[in-house]
Amino acid sequence: MRHRKIGRRFNKSATHVKAMLKNMVCSLFRYEMIKTTVSKAKELRRVAEPLITCAKIDSVANRRLVFSRIRDNKIVFKLFRDLGPHFLGQFGGYTRILRCGFRSGDQAPMAYIQLINRVKNKKELVYKK
């Protein structure tokens, strides 16, 4: 019985699920929008939102805590420099899940998970006419 068990397993081992979610959260923070299955997007939201909340207060302890979860210096830097201050006035609800149809191979329901009010890249702002 799975009583009081939190999280989805996706028919994978616990270490595989942990590594998969770590890679997906890095991709989400890097590109600010990724396409995945609906169930993976829902599980990813449980991992990503506490990291953004932690990044709103820039301290050494918070940086070390976030780095222990995602292990990528560039992403930690972007999280504390861009995303944390961007969501400073917002209390939760930093991500949005948009369903986008079904995968052609196995008809799995697909979705985009994106950050709310995405931070525009400087390249987009310069070349937009």
Curated annotation (Swiss-Prot):
Pfam assignment, any one: Ribosomal_L17
Keyword Lipoprotein: no
InterPro entries found in the cross-reference section: Ribosomal_bL17, Ribosomal_bL17_CS, Ribosomal_bL17_sf
Protein's GO biological process: translation
A single GO cellular-component term on record: cytosolic large ribosomal subunit
GO molecular function, one term: structural constituent of ribosome
Ribonucleoprotein as UniProt keyword: yes
Origin: domain of life: Bacteria
Entry keywords, A to Z: Ribonucleoprotein, Ribosomal protein
Family the entry assigns: Belongs to the bacterial ribosomal protein bL17 family.
Subunit structure, as described in the record: Part of the 50S ribosomal subunit. Contacts protein L32.
Name of the featured protein: Large ribosomal subunit protein bL17
Protein's organism: Buchnera aphidicola subsp. Baizongia pistaciae (strain Bp)
